[in-house]
């Protein structure tokens, strides 16, 4: 697993998926799963999860623990599970977060492993959906904000 140009390869993959989806709006993408376990996608997913920090899930494994184990080894094992259909998401760790009014709200914290897979899936499917979204849509989209939506209105 080479990490040096994963970002560029992922950008090219996403651009290709976006352009294909934009060109053929009736096209259905039946085979995106193989994109999730690509080396470059898993490496980029790892980098994004690591940059986002966050605490460990129910397994207690932290980002630092994975770095000590060896990122390449960890991602190879995860890739193998995904390819063989043996990947099973872990339960979510439930933490109660205090609200300003004194009550609490539940927060679910997935394991780092599950966050990597979720991010890899996001990397694969996001450009397909982006191609269908309208220009006037701003909610929860990359490189768009509430401020930009207000400027348009």
Give the location of each predicted region.
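Conserved pre-catalytic core of RNA-dependent polymerases
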Residues: 2-153
């Amino acid at each position: 697993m080479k990490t040096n140009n994963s970002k560029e390869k992922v950008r090219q993959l996403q651009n290709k998926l976006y352009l294909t989806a934009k060109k053929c709006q009736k096209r259905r993408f039946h085979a995106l799963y193989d994109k999730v376990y690509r080396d470059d996608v898993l490496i980029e997913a790892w980098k994004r999860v690591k940059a986002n920090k966050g605490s460990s899930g129910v397994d207690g494994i932290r980002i630092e623990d994975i770095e000590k184990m060896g990122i390449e080894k960890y991602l190879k094992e995860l890739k193998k599970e995904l390819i063989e259909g043996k990947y099973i998401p872990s339960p979510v760790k439930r933490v109660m977060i205090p609200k300003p009014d004194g009550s609490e709200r539940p927060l679910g914290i997935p394991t780092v492993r599950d966050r990597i897979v979720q991010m890899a899936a996001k990397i694969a499917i996001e450009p397909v959906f982006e191609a269908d979204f309208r220009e006037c849509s701003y909610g929860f989209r990359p490189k768009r904000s509430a401020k930009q939506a207000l400027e348009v209105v």
